[in-house]
Structures are given as C-alpha cells and as structure tokens.
C-alpha cells in the first residue's frame, strides 16, 4: 500500500475521533493547549494500537484467505465507512456523545482519564477492523500505525481547539467525510488487486 493511501486511511479513521474531540472541546469550560494535547494523545494512542491488534489477528489467518484479501479490504472499509456516514445523519444523539455528556457537571465539565479511555476505545473499534485488512495488503505495520497515531493526534488536537466555535456543524461533516474516504480507499484497493479495469477498457 502506498503512502498516500495510508495517509488517507489515517485521516478517514481519525474523523470519528475528531468529531468526539470537537464535542469535548465544546463542552470543556476552559480549553487549553495542554488539554488538547492530552486528549490527542489518548485518541492517537488507541487509534495506533487497535490496527496493530487487528493486524496481528489477520496475520494468523493470512494463509487461509489471502486469495480474498481485496474482498476483505473492500467489505471492511465499506462497512466501516457506511456506518460512519449512517451515524452522522441519523437523528438520535450519537452514543459517544452520550458518554461524554454523562461526565458533564454544570458549566464546568469533567473529562478525566477514565472518560478519555472509554471515548478512545469507542472511536478506535473501526481501526481494529481496518488493521485486519492490513495483514493482506503488504504494509509496513510499524510505519503505518505511527502515521495513524500521529495524524489522529494532530487532528484531535485541532478538533479540541476549534470545538467551542463550530462543534455541531463540523462534527457531522467530519464523520461523513471520513466515511466517504474509507469507502473510496476500499474501492481503490479492490480495483488494484483485481485489475478489473483492464477487463472493462
């Protein structure tokens, strides 16, 4: 997998965490750079850890389903991307927002480490599934998870900083964009591995 694809996947995966970071930034009474760094480290760390776990699982079964790798990547990324889009347009409040709001007390909002761990896990489950597909795509897993973690950290830091001003609007658009990006990457991988365009043109 080329570097551009890894970066795009990283951005797509980070959109869910970005959306929650915006929510956190909007609910914290006084947003500081140190708080943004702390939130970014939690989300970036888990977003890097989950693909590694998924990759480890996928490696164990590589010999059995290597011939289906492109289908696995397409299906996983499409399901994840579709879920992100669906979650962003449904009317009910997102569950991750409910977790964050449960820790709100009056105007001064509490965002302790336990809260961040719960939110980081909730927003990195998709990365676990993507990690499984990495096992069949010949990627450098260490470089990949470093990129994913770093991009997520930066994006979440930015999300916290701007959450106060444009939280709700940007949250929805970020999740939709992330979903579309993941679906397109899945289609790209499928086309490359099957060389299907050569049969059409």
Swiss-Prot record:
Keywords: Cell membrane, Ion transport, Manganese, Membrane, Transmembrane, Transmembrane helix, Transport
CC per GO annotation: plasma membrane
The family this protein is said to belong to: Belongs to the MntP (TC 9.B.29) family.
Function (record text): Probably functions as a manganese efflux pump.
Organism this protein belongs to: Clostridium botulinum (strain Langeland / NCTC 10281 / Type F)
Ranges that cross the membrane: 3-23, 39-59, 65-85, 116-136, 141-161, 176-196
Cellular compartments annotated: Cell membrane
Organism taxonomic ancestry: Bacteria, Bacillati, Bacillota, Clostridia, Eubacteriales
Cystine crosslinks: none
Keyword Cell membrane in record: yes
Protein's name according to its UniProt entry: Putative manganese efflux pump MntP 2
InterPro entries tied to this protein: MFS_trans_sf (IPR036259), Mntp/YtaF (IPR003810), Put_MntP (IPR022929)
Topology in the lipid bilayer: Multi-pass membrane protein
Gene Ontology molecular function: manganese ion transmembrane transporter activity
């Amino acid at each position: 997998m080329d570097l551009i694809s890894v970066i795009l996947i990283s951005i797509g995966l980070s959109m869910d965490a970005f959306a929650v970071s915006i929510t956190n930034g909007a609910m914290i009474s006084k947003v500081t750079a140190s708080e943004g760094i702390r939130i970014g480290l939690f989300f970036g760390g888990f977003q890097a850890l989950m693909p590694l776990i998924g990759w480890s699982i996928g490696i164990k079964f590589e010999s059995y389903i290597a011939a289906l790798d492109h289908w696995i990547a397409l299906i996983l990324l499409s399901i994840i991307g579709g879920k992100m889009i669906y979650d962003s347009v449904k009317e009910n409040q997102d569950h991750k927002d409910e977790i964050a709001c449960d820790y709100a007390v009056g105007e001064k909002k509490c965002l302790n480490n336990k809260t961040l761990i719960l939110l980081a896990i909730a927003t990195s489950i998709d990365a676990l599934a993507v990690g499984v597909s990495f096992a069949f795509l010949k990627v450098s897993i260490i470089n990949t998870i470093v990129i994913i973690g770093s991009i997520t950290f930066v994006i979440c830091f930015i999300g916290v900083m701007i959450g106060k001003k444009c939280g709700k609007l940007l949250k929805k658009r970020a999740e939709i964009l992330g979903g579309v990006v993941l679906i397109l990457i899945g289609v790209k991988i499928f086309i490359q591995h099957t060389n299907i365009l050569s049969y059409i043109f």
